[in-house]
Amino acid sequence: MDNYLQQILNHKRFGIGIVSSGTTGEPKLIWRSPDNLRACNEVAIHAQQLTSKSKVLTVTKTDHAGGLLLQTLPAYTLGCKVIDVEKFNAFNFLKKIKGYTHTFLTPEQMKAVMMTKGFKDCDLSGIRILGGSNPVSWEIIEAFVSKGALVQHNWGMSEIGPMVINIEIDSIEHIEYLKQRTPKSYTILGNAYWCDWKIVDHELYVKSDMCIEPGWFATGDIVALDMGKRMYYKGRK
């Protein structure tokens, strides 16, 4: 991985292909240049407060944007001493996660962890759990926050960057506050924007250095805003 990282950082014409998750269509290979990877890295580091002392556990596929670009590659560029990449196992996850500060889970993985025997009495204090790839329900967010975790609901796409809009949720009171403001049939996207954005006929458009193409990208996602400029997701166009 160290040699792989140096190629990304030092070679102008080098790039890597990331497999899209397939949530918005057929999975495809997305090519990212070194400059694009740097942009994704910078946002991931700042948005998640990653430092050289962070300890990252990756349990998602590293050929996908979520598995590689959200935490794993940023942690390597920071020189983190503890970075482990493992195949996801819901039963083992709770036993191991206490030694880490950051991880990323899909909603399906979060549900699987919730169903394990150990979840009822687990303590996730001091752990930032990034949740995304698909919308994360309030029920799931509340379950993990009630165990002490900071849940960072994250929205991104393979084409526009892994971490584009998100929100940190660390208390039941915050959840109740947000639930009261969530429009019917919508789920939370976030209130922290790491891109330029606009809404045209209810569809979200974004633009940033993390996008694989210049200019405005039509996401195909139908969204809404509340008075506090928090964004919510309804579904695909």
Tell me the role of every PLM-derived stretch.
Residues T23, S133, G156, D221, ...:
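Active-site glycine-centered loops adjacent to acidic/histidine catalytic or metal-binding residues
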Residues M1-Q6, K28-W31, C80-F88:
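Short beta-strand->loop structural element characteristic of the AMP-binding/adenylate-forming
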Residues G15-E42:
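Conserved AMP-binding A3 loop
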Residues A39-K55, D63-H102:
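Conserved AMP-binding/adenylation subdomain of ANL enzymes
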Residues K184-N191:
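Short Gly/Pro-enriched turn/cap motifs at secondary-structure boundaries
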Residues H102-L105, M114-T182:
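Gly/Ser/Thr-rich phosphate-binding loop
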Residues T187, K198-I199, E203-K237:
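Conserved ATP-binding/catalytic segment of the ANL
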Residues D2-V19, Q49-K55:
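Conserved pre-ATP/AMP-binding loop-to-beta segment of ANL
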